[in-house]
């Protein structure tokens, strides 16, 4: 059973709602209801225009601006202290920053979603450092990026090459995921988790991409094995971002006929729950970030990136403990 409740408040001049998603599941002979809650805290518009991804750590947020080719940083709750990082130079600008990964030592990795590189931002000096990679890596529109804690490898969804690669942060070594099942097509957000790599993967009508229909979430336990597992599939929509909450709830951003957030209970065989599309912000839900300390979920909304008639922003939700 799915039950939706909405309670409207005024926070930062933005209407908020409480969305309750109820997922019924069957265990043995007993039937009980398990609840997943998303409680909106704020909707931030105006500070960023077309963000693909927003992340936070240590009281500060970073946003990747797709159209303006910039990174934006600011303290949480203090919009007047926003800092804009000049990414690159006029002669060497960033080609549409898409996804971010916060590393140790005040460094943030940024993918060039419409370019060929991964860049590193020194957030203390607010300057950009080119990340050294092998000259023959030849990335094409890299999107999702992630690094495991204390890990050697940077994992990259190399979207227009229809592949998943990893690059050593200690040397010039790099490897391509063998993908024996030919499932990887146009990868967007990528998560590095203890239980493997999770990829938001879409089958789009583009030359050179692996064929397929709709989109799916792939999990890869062993990179060198070349094998992947389909965790969820959507026949009628492309996929943007994803996040896994409490090792149970898979959240995905959907673009197309369903321009909303889908919720999958990984511990049951129940159907996907689709949250109501938001009518207070433009564009599809794109990059996701779950802060396990504050239990805040940040969802970036692109706005209208084609006609550019409407800007986007990001929503902040609180996820209560079950």
Feature annotation, model-predicted:
Residues 77-82, 122-126, 168-172, 221-225, ...:
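Short loop/turn segments that connect beta-strands within beta-propeller blades
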Residues 71-75, 164, 207-217, 258-262, ...:
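Structural motif
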Residues 39-45, 83-91, 127-135, 173-180, ...:
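A short beta-strand motif characteristic of beta-propeller blades
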């Amino acid at each position: 059973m799915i039950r939706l409740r909405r309670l409207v408040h005024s926070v930062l001049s933005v209407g908020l709602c409480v969305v309750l998603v109820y997922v019924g599941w069957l265990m043995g002979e007993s039937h009980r209801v398990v609840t997943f809650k998303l409680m909106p805290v704020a909707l931030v518009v105006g500070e960023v225009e077309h963000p693909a991804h927003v992340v936070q750590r240590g009281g500060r947020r970073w946003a990747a601006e797709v159209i303006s080719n910039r990174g934006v940083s600011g303290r949480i709750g203090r919009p007047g202290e926003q800092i804009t990082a000049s990414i690159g130079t006029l002669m060497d600008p960033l080609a549409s920053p898409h996804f971010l990964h916060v590393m140790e030592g005040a460094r943030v990795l940024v993918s060039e979603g419409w370019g060929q590189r991964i860049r590193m931002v020194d957030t203390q000096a607010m300057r950009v450092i080119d990340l050294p990679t092998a000259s023959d890596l030849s990335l094409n529109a890299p999107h999702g990026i992630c690094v495991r804690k204390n890990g050697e490898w940077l994992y990259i969804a190399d979207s227009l090459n229809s592949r998943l690669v990893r690059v050593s942060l200690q040397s010039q070594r790099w490897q391509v995921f063998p993908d024996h099942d030919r499932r990887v097509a146009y990868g967007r957000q990528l998560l590095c988790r203890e239980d493997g790599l999770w990829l938001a993967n879409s089958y789009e009508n583009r030359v050179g991409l692996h064929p397929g229909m709709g989109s799916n979430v792939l999990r890869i336990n062993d990179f060198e094995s070349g094998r992947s597992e389909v965790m969820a599939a959507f026949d009628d929509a492309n996929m943007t971002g994803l996040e896994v909450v409490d090792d149970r709830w898979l959240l995905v951003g959907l673009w197309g006929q369903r321009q909303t957030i889908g919720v999958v209970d990984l511990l049951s065989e129940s159907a996907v729950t689709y949250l109501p599309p938001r009518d207070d912000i433009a564009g599809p839900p794109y990059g996701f970030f779950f802060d396990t300390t504050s239990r805040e979920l940040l969802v970036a909304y692109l706005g209208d990136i084609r006609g550019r008639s409407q800007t986007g922003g990001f929503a902040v939700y609180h996820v209560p403990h079950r």
